[in-house]
A protein has these predicted regions:
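Long, hydrophobic, well-ordered secondary-structure blocks that form the structural core
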Residues: 103-115, 126
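Glycine- and acidic-residue-enriched helix-capping/strand-helix junction motifs
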Residues: 118-121, 231
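Catalytic cores of soluble, metal-dependent hydrolases
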Residues: 2-81, 85-102, 125, 135-286
Length: 286
């Protein structure tokens, strides 16, 4: 897997945070301590503010243009997507994966709303659209939405048939948090997700792509522009670590993060958000 880093600028929030400079320092620190890192990660910042029709909903022209700009980079690496309004960008990165794979999503929302406005890609329905249109996406693990929201989404998916419903493993915020104090709680939850794709080798697991929306986290770890959950970042990172350990040799494709709040002009708030991004970056590189 390539360990390069992409910062996607739609709202200007990353410039407000000074994220690129902070990540450069983080990379230098990790490289200095690493003993076997093949190459120093490259940080690329691309500006998309010239593309209209991207906020919350992504029209077909914008989707095509964004897709063209990210093709040269491939799906590998760590991608910063801006606010949760742009979480649909994950779908575009997934379209660059050219083999069967699995998607692990941490989000306070299901992001599986029925298409609206003529089926335009949206931040609220991108997972559903990816399941419907990406033949290589074999399985989705969704961690973090409230139980009630999950049950409502399951009903909506069931109305369209059992095929989509059968491709999703659900872990609600309530289930995730109620196991925190139990021994081996992460192993137990990961065990629910340990699914081998039908097209994968019987001895291996499908390659994995991970997407994190910071709105799964409590506001103490970063304020977003959406309603938020109560999960702690360390719990998310530990879950990922244990899940990967349960399938030795699994290919890790890449990861993305969204969930900034461009409207928060408080320097302290943006600093907390940036530090959360730095922590995720450090985890990714190690």
């Amino acid at each position: 897997m390539k360990n390069n880093i992409m910062i996607m600028n739609f709202s200007g929030v990353y410039e407000m945070q000074g994220l690129k400079t902070a990540l450069e320092k983080k990379v230098d620190s990790v490289v200095a301590e690493a003993e076997n890192m093949a190459a120093k990660p490259v940080i690329t910042q691309l500006d998309f503010q010239d593309i209209p029709g991207t906020n919350c909903y992504c029209d077909s022209l914008a989707e095509e243009e964004i897709g063209k700009r990210i093709i040269p980079f491939g799906p590998e690496g760590l991608h910063f997507l801006d606010s949760g309004n742009y979480h649909y960008l994950t779908k575009l990165w997934l379209e660059l994966v050219k083999e069967p794979f699995e998607l692990l999503v941490f989000d306070h929302h299901t992001d599986m709303q029925c298409p609206a406005f003529g089926g335009i890609l949206s931040c609220g329905g991108w997972i559903r659209e990816a399941l419907e249109t990406n033949d290589n996406l074999k399985h989705v693990i969704l961690v973090g939405p409230p139980q009630a929201a999950m049950e409502e989404t399951k009903k909506e998916l069931a109305e369209d048939g059992e095929e989509l419903l059968g491709k999703v493993t659900w872990i609600s915020e309530e289930e995730f948090l109620q196991n925190v104090e139990k021994p081996n709680w992460i192993q137990k939850l990961c065990g629910q997700c340990n699914v081998t794709g039908a097209e994968a080798d019987e001895k291996e697991q499908l390659p994995l792509y991970i997407s994190i929306d910071k709105d799964i986290l409590s506001e103490s770890e970063g304020k977003t522009n959406w309603d938020q959950g109560n999960v702690v970042l360390d719990q998310v990172l530990q879950f990922i670590d244990v899940y990967m350990q349960q399938t030795p040799g699994r290919q890790f494709i890449g990861m993305d993060i969204c969930g900034e709040d461009p409207e928060a002009d408080n320097e302290e708030v943006q600093t907390v958000c940036r530090k959360t991004s730095e922590k995720i970056c450090g985890f990714f590189l190690c």
